[in-house]
Amino acid sequence: MLMIRKTGTLRGRISALIFVVLLCWCPLTLWAAVDDAPAINPEIETELPVNPMAAAPPSLLEALRKIRALSFCGEAVPMERQDVRERFEKELLLTLGNRPQAILYLKRQLRYLPHIEAVLEKEDLPDDLKYLAVAESALIPDIRSRSGAMGIWQFMPDTGRNHGLMIDSYIDERRDFSTATQAAIAYLRKLYDQFGSWSLAAAAYNMGDNGLAADIELQQTNDYFELVLPDETE
């Protein structure tokens, strides 16, 4: 939720949803690349000519292109679409290209995601929703956006108050990870009931339900991957 820029220039742009999903898939993709490497027989290894390229595992992009199916909260991501796949590959490469940041993501996940997972399981909601917190705030608990959103779940003041968070000059429960998590999950359930899709619920969480409803009405589609949405939401 860090600085929304409304451009509306390209259809079918992929959103933070892809970034959310790829955080789950990165380790699997990397292991797949290693597992697919040609096996070396130690008995004949010394008899073979040295060819580093022949023994090298497939590139990351080669491993990525083997992925044929991907989903978010049980909803299929259309990886057969070139724009979707290209955005997925771009976001993954950008994430892995910044190794210090990628390491920080992994460390923060160990600290925060288990609690979110437990709450989602208790509420019988999709586990993938935990990655919205990563996309919203990079799991930085005291982060504040230019627009005034605060905390790991990036609640705006009015939205936070509407979902039971105490926000005044002395207390700001948006900074309280546990309390804000409960509020965020309740809000996501409400958005799913309103829009009937977790992809749309994730978009509405980022840009606001009124904004998404207006875009759906204006563009005459409720297909998440066809909607032209704010850059940050996409």
Q: What are the roles of these predicted feature ranges?
A:
Residues 2-4, 13-14, 22-124:
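An acidic, Gly/Ser/Thr/Pro-rich helix-cap/linker signature
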Residues 79-234:
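Catalytic glycan-binding domains that act on GlcNAc-containing polysaccharides
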